[in-house]
C-alpha cells in the first residue's frame, strides 16, 4: 500500500494496549459540544467514549465528537444500547474507532456485535464511502476495509453473572478485542453493589483477566472501581488491566463545582 492510499487514522488507545501500556479513557454522557474532545486531549487522556446507553446525546452529536477526537489524536469509542447493532454501524460510519457493547452475556451476543462492526471476511459491516477515519479521501476499498478491521475495536462488556460465567467463550470470539468490566453492574449482580474492592469482585476480575490473556485480548476497567485505592488499581494493572475508564463529564463537573463552593465558603467564613 502506498502512502497516497494509506488511511492515516490510527487508534491511539489500541496502540498503547498492544504495547503493554495503560490507556486512560474519559466518558461523555451529557456534553454536546465538540470542545469536550479538546478538553480530554489537553488533560492527557488518549481516548473518550460517548455514552449512548446512559447518556442524553444523539447519534449525530456523537459523530461530531468522534470526528473532533480523530482530529486531535484521541481514540473515539461509543457505547451503544444493548444489542443495538444498527446504531453501532451508524456511529462507526460517523467516525468512531470502536464500539462498547454492553450486557454481553454469551458468545452469541459478542458474535452479533462483531459482525456489525467488522467488514468481511470477519463480519458483515456495510460499506460507506468517504469515512471520517480516512479523512474523506478516495482510497481503494480493499485497503480501507483491511485497515479499519485492524484499527476498529469491539469492547465486550462483562457486567452480569451470565457474562462472567461465559467469559472464556466470549473472549474466544474472533473480532472481540477487549473485555470491558462493568464493575458497577457486576457488583450489583453478584449481590455486593458498590463493594468494588471485595474478594468476590477481585476473583471475578482474576477470571476475566485470565480469559483475556488466554485468547490474546485486552481488559478494560469501567464502573466505580476506578475511584478505589491506588493500591487496588496498581495491583490490577500489574495483573494485566490495560485500560481504565477515568471519570465522566457529569461527575467531574459536579466534583469541581462542589470543591469550588467549599473553597469560597472557607474564604468568606
Task: Mark where each language-model region is.
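N-terminal amphipathic alpha-helix/helix-capping segment at the start of soluble metabolic enzymes
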Residues: 1-27, 138-150, 207-210, 214
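Conserved anion-binding
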Residues: 86, 98-174, 185-188
Amino acid at each position: 500500500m502506498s502512502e497516497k492510499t494509506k488511511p492515516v487514522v490510527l487508534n491511539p488507545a489500541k496502540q498503547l494496549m498492544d504495547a503493554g501500556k495503560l490507556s486512560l479513557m474519559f466518558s461523555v454522557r451529557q456534553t454536546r459540544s465538540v470542545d469536550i474532545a479538546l478538553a480530554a486531549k489537553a488533560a492527557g487522556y488518549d481516548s473518550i467514549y460517548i455514552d449512548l446507553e446512559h447518556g442524553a446525546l444523539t447519534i449525530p452529536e456523537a459523530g461530531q465528537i468522534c470526528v473532533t477526537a480523530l482530529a486531535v489524536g484521541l481514540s473515539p469509542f461509543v457505547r451503544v444500547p444493548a444489542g443495538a447493532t444498527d446504531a453501532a454501524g451508524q456511529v462507526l460510519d460517523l467516525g468512531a474507532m470502536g464500539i462498547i457493547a454492553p450486557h454481553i452475556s454469551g458468545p452469541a451476543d459478542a458474535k452479533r456485535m462483531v459482525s456489525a462492526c467488522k467488514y468481511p471476511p470477519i463480519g458483515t459491516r456495510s460499506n460507506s464511502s468517504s469515512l471520517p477515519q480516512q479523512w474523506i479521501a478516495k482510497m481503494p476499498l480493499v485497503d480501507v476495509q483491511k485497515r479499519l478491521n485492524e484499527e476498529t475495536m469491539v469492547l465486550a462488556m462483562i457486567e452480569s453473572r451470565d457474562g462472567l460465567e461465559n467469559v472464556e467463550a466470549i473472549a474466544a470470539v474472533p473480532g472481540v478485542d477487549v473485555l470491558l468490566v462493568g464493575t458497577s453492574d457486576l457488583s450489583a449482580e453478584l449481590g455486593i453493589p458498590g463493594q468494588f474492592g471485595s474478594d468476590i469482585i477481585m476473583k471475578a476480575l482474576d477470571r476475566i483477566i485470565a480469559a483475556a490473556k488466554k485468547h490474546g485480548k485486552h481488559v478494560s476497567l469501567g464502573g466505580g472501581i476506578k475511584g478505589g485505592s491506588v493500591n487496588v488499581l496498581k495491583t490490577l494493572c500489574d495483573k494485566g488491566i490495560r485500560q481504565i475508564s477515568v471519570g465522566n463529564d457529569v461527575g467531574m463537573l459536579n466534583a469541581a463545582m462542589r470543591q469550588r463552593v467549599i473553597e469560597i465558603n472557607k474564604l468568606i467564613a
